[in-house]
């Protein structure tokens, strides 16, 4: 589909417009403009409504458009190629041309990279346009984000999940109003030759550090190649890339006559059900539902996912609002999900397929979490994992309650009850978080340190309670996900506008601000703790203390092979001394982590460990009295 270069010269073109009477190719090919409705530019139509043609003068970088004549009473005019790999800057969007790009020209360096097991994933969510800004008011690009790869690897995460990167109808955007599903978003692409050379130097330095050959500026000339370069360098440095895709709705297409909306130019623009790709349904998710009852529309979306796998080496997908998709499309939506997941699993079995599904959000299509993650063979939708808000809600509520003072009620037991994700057979099927793009965007809920201390977001109270929240996330079962800036105590809401104050405040780290640098080191060490102890990435968890009066929680993580980890935390404003808890076995238990070591002086702790020699307690065979730092947590392992 779309425009594809042919070995030996020229390109084939193919587009779906079943009710059109004629489709012509127009553009500039080999420096020669070809326009109008002439026989040599007319495509031929097959029995399924697909139009195709070949032009031997077409080549890499050429600009093109399709001219579509609708049926009687319909309209005539240009349409962009729905499969265009890139859009041009020749005219302002949405009236721009498409660009012919080779899908396989990029010189990949990632042959040895393997997508991590789901249980071993630690995800970092970011927005390309604001994550790595170097000039105020100008969105950061795919190549700017490459410069942050060493930072991300030093943090310890092993998956990045950018918000949607395809072309949208309005910029700046979160990315959920997609217009051109196969084209990278304009603002994320570098076109200035001088800037390209600067980025090339960064890329080649990163490649040289890994003993890999350099690239040339021609290798990153296109936006298509720049996104490939981002994924490639991530893989070289051990980072998987999960793409966020939006198949539950299309963009609004306001004033965009060249979009997929009414692609074959049917006369009736009053009924979106006649628009070919869309329906008249809108759940308030940002645009019209896609016509998933149509096999060709379903295949278009499946082809889009395959495109990210084949041409961008995708390691997974976050599927936006699958609950909305199923509600609006009923049986056809269910069929689509099963076709999608089954096809992609056949092509790339290690691919993470993560559904944003909220049971009960739309009661008219009642499916359970287990239905969503059950395999296609067992009658399910076939997704591997889903977003899960149980732990997030419990932790955020507890932190907020604690901020009202030492006499306020704190539901610590809710955290304990949500350590294992409800409704799922396996913990690794839940992607858990404390913050994400939806939760902490401007005008929505506050970031964690603001929840923790509404009057001073960088106080000891804000930092210590935020450490507690991060500790619960990174020691609980599931796939933990961080949101950009969370790792260094970002307290500002985020926004898509590329201007302060709602950008990640990298200057706090560059100026060595204490609260930011200490919290960053805390996050790094806590992530390393998760890597050091496989039990923290396993399935087993047993909360054995959940005392709301004391604001104390304790839980056991273990592997059947014997890796035992005990986590004890509190949201009390006082340190607990001589606090008796159970331990799985008698003997010495080493304190391997203490959140109080990051910003408190003196540190309240257990002098490196405790001797569990007391009587059975909390369902264990031994016990010991420990110190639990105020608004903090400690972690013990055998040894």
Q: Model regions: which residues?
A:
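Glycine-rich, histidine-containing beta strand-loop boundary motifs that form or position
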Residues: 15, 27, 55, 68, ...
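Conserved alpha/beta catalytic core and glycan-binding cleft of carbohydrate-active enzymes
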Residues: 89-94, 313, 329-499, 531-594, ...
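Short, contiguous acidic/charged loop-to-helix segments that flank catalytic cores in large enzymes
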Residues: 186-188, 218, 292-294, 327-331, ...
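Short, flexible loop/turn elements at secondary-structure junctions
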Residues: 17-19, 29, 47, 57, ...
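Structural signature of outer-membrane beta-barrel domains
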Residues: 73, 324, 360-362
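Substrate-binding/active-site clefts of carbohydrate-active enzymes
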Residues: 84-88, 105, 111-118, 127-314, ...
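Carbohydrate-interacting/catalytic domains
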Residues: 1-120, 147-153, 462-463, 474-482, ...
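Alpha-helical packing segments of well-folded alpha/beta enzyme cores
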Residues: 148, 226-230, 297, 301-308, ...
């Amino acid at each position: 589909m779309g425009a594809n270069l042919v070995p030996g010269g020229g390109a084939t073109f193919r587009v779906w417009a079943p009710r059109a009477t004629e489709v012509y190719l127009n553009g500039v090919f080999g420096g020669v403009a070809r326009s109008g409705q002439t026989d040599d530019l007319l495509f031929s139509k097959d029995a399924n409504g697909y139009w195709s043609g070949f032009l031997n003068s077409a080549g890499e970088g050429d600009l093109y458009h399709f001219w579509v004549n609708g049926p009687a009473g319909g309209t005539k005019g240009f349409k962009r190629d729905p499969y265009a790999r890139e859009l041009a800057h020749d005219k302002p969007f949405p009236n721009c041309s498409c660009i012919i790009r080779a899908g396989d020209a990029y010189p990949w360096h990632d042959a040895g990279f393997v997508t991590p097991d789901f249980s071993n994933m630690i995800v970092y969510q970011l927005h390309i346009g604001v994550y790595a800004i170097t000039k105020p008011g100008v969105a950061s690009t795919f190549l700017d984000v490459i410069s942050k790869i060493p930072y991300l690897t030093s943090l310890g995460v092993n998956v990045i999940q950018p918000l949607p990167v395809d072309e949208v109808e309005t910029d700046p955007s979160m990315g959920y109003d997609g217009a051109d599903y196969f084209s990278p978003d304009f603002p994320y692409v570098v076109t200035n030759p001088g800037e390209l050379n600067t980025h090339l130097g960064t890329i080649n330095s990163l490649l040289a550090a890994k003993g890999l050959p350099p690239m040339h500026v021609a290798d990153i000339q296109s936006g298509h190649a720049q996104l490939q370069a981002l994924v490639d360098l991530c893989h070289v440095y051990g980072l998987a890339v999960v793409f966020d895709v939006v198949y539950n709705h299309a963009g609004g297409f306001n004033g965009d006559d060249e979009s997929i909306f009414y692609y074959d130019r049917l006369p009736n623009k009053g009924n979106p059900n006649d628009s070919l790709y869309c329906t008249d349904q809108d759940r308030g998710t940002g645009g019209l539902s896609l016509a998933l009852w149509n096999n060709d529309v379903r295949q278009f979306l499946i082809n889009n996912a395959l495109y990210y796998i084949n041409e961008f080496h995708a390691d997974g997908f976050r599927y936006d609002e699958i609950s909305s998709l199923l509600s609006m499309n009923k049986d056809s939506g269910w069929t689509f999900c099963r076709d999608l997941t089954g096809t992609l699993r056949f092509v790339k079995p290690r691919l993470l397929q993560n559904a944003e599904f909220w049971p009960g959000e739309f009661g008219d299509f009642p499916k359970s979490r287990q239905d969503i993650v059950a395999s296609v063979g067992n009658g399910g939708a076939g997704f591997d994992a889903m977003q899960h808000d149980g732990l997030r809600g419990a932790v955020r509520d507890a932190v907020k309650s604690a901020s009202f003072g030492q006499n306020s009620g704190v539901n610590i037991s809710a955290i304990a009850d949500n350590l294992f994700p409800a409704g799922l057979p396996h913990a690794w099927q839940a992607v858990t978080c404390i913050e994400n793009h939806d939760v902490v965007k401007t005008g929505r809920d506050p970031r964690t340190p603001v929840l923790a201390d509404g009057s001073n977001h960088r106080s000891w109270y804000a930092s210590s309670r935020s450490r507690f929240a991060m500790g619960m996330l990174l020691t609980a079962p599931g796939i933990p996900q961080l949101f950009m800036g969370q790792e260094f105590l970002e307290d500002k809401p985020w926004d898509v506008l590329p201007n302060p104050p709602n950008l990640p405040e990298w200057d706090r780290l560059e100026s060595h601000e204490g609260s930011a640098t200490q919290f960053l080191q805390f996050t790094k060490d806590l992530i390393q703790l998760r890597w050091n102890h496989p039990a923290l990435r396993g399935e087993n968890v047993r909360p054995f203390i959940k005392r709301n009066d004391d604001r104390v929680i304790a839980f056991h993580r273990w592997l059947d092979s014997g890796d035992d980890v005990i986590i004890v935390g509190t949201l009390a404003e006082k340190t607990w001394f001589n606090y008796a808890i159970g331990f799985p076995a008698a003997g010495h238990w080493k304190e391997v982590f203490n959140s109080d070591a990051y910003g408190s002086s003196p540190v309240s702790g257990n002098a490196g460990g405790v001797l569990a020699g007391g009587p059975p307690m909390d369902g264990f065979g031994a016990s010991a009295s420990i110190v639990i730092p105020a608004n903090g947590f400690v972690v013990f392992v055998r040894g």
